[in-house]
Amino acid sequence: MNINFSKDDITGLPKSTKEEDENDFSSLDYSDLFMDVEIGRGSFGQVQKASYFGTDVAVKQLSTLVSIDPDYFKFMLREIKILKGMRHPNIVQYIGACCHEGRYMIVTEYIKGGDLHQFIKARGVSNISWTLRMKLALDIASAFSYLHSKKVIFRDLKAKNILVDEIGDGLYRAKVIDFGFARIFDGKDTNNLTICGSENTMSPEVIVGSSYNDSCDVYSYGVLLLELICGSRVVKTQLKRTPMNAFDMNLEKAEHLAPESCPRAFMDLAKWCCSYNPKDRPTFKIVVEGLKVLTNQQLKDLPVKGKSKPYIDPDEDSFIDPNDDSNNNNNSENNNNNNDNSNENNENNNENNNNSNENNNKKNKNGSGGDISGSSVIIKTDEEESFNSVVYKEHAVAQPLPNIDYGGQNKRQNNIFNPSFFTPPPNSKSMMDLKQSSAVDEDEDEDEDDVPSELLTSLTVNDIRYSNPKSFAATISTPNLNYATALDQDPPKPLSQSACATVLGGIPPMQPKKKPNNKNKKKKKKL
């Protein structure tokens, strides 16, 4: 099937010759593929296992929309041309592409394990050792450090786009897949970038349609780290970002929800990557060097987060004490007996049980945390001076660079000047609806890969951060974000006739015309 779209109109592509462009869709013969079972499905199509000259491969069959929609064709062409030029142990290996009966297919190496989302869900986040969590985090950061060095911006980093390959007994390797939203980024045309990605991991500047750069991948990586630390369910429900807080991550709440056995430096890294200001986020080069230091040390020697002070959520007026063992045990008993469970407990029972297991085992015999110590790991922020050791406060005093917010400790005091921005008006029905919607248990496997058809809003980040929520609640248009409905007010009720007369200055409302009596016409016809 011939393609009618012009490749010259597509930006963000690597440079190539005409001969290479013609071979993009015919680098292998479909008849050489022996298709097997389906192993995955997404908004762009389905993925099947196949055999290619005796080697197991994964075949991504793209949707038929690629042939008729120029946007889908653009994403497909970028994925092929970018993926075939990548060579990294933590990036899925590209094999070729072909077209069969009008359907385009991308063939890559086959990874036996599932994605990271399934990996966490099947095992339970508390059953994954901190050694493995930091190892997977290092693999992902290594891949993205390589991508950014090649001027590639990914724009859809999430757990479902990370495959976990079991390479040995208890040994795993993370690999990045699905380059459908990736593009070449030279840092010049930041205002022309399309808004795309998954709503749960998109950075604030991408959500509001502002200009962005490769630091949006760092923010998504920070959200992914919080999933490795707290669990996917906690990030999706209790740490859900909404327009009422300018899509900012509540890092103070995340600190309290994290298990006390989490290495202090690992938690600080996640908070640092989730900095609201893109300029405050680290580069992946810095992240890789820091994680290398952490993974090369014994976990028992690493300081852990420890117990957190009780926390009151200002948005929900709820008291959170994740380190109270008695509360966690009570939640576990209520879970087993199915007695006196509220909607909040129903959402978080599994996560509370996991947290209680970690809280009761601070030292963790399997090596998933060390003794609580007064020292803490300091992450350096100087790119030129890379990580070569972990610095402890009792051995050396580190001077942080100015204007760097380590995990957002000062964010709540500095980034919002209008206190009413976070405080809704009294008896606000929209806020009640927002709380109720956040209490609804959402399906973790819900597909989040839809391509937004339009900008979510024309407002910039500063417009949203410094404006009253009512002013942008009516402006924002979020067809792919489910919290837009919580901000919308109920439709007004129709006015009564007396009210209409009052509004119109005493003019009575127009009466509807009476329908003609068709029965008389029928009788006349009979006569």
Swiss-Prot record:
GO molecular-function terms, A-Z: ATP binding; protein serine kinase activity; protein serine/threonine kinase activity
Keyword Nucleotide-binding (UniProt): yes
GO terms for cellular component: autophagosome; cytoplasm; cytosol; phagophore assembly site; phagophore assembly site membrane
Gene3D superfamilies: Phosphorylase Kinase, domain 1, Transferase(Phosphotransferase) domain 1
EC primary class: transferase
Similarity field: Belongs to the protein kinase superfamily. TKL Ser/Thr protein kinase family.
Name of the molecule in the record: Probable serine/threonine-protein kinase DDB_G0271538
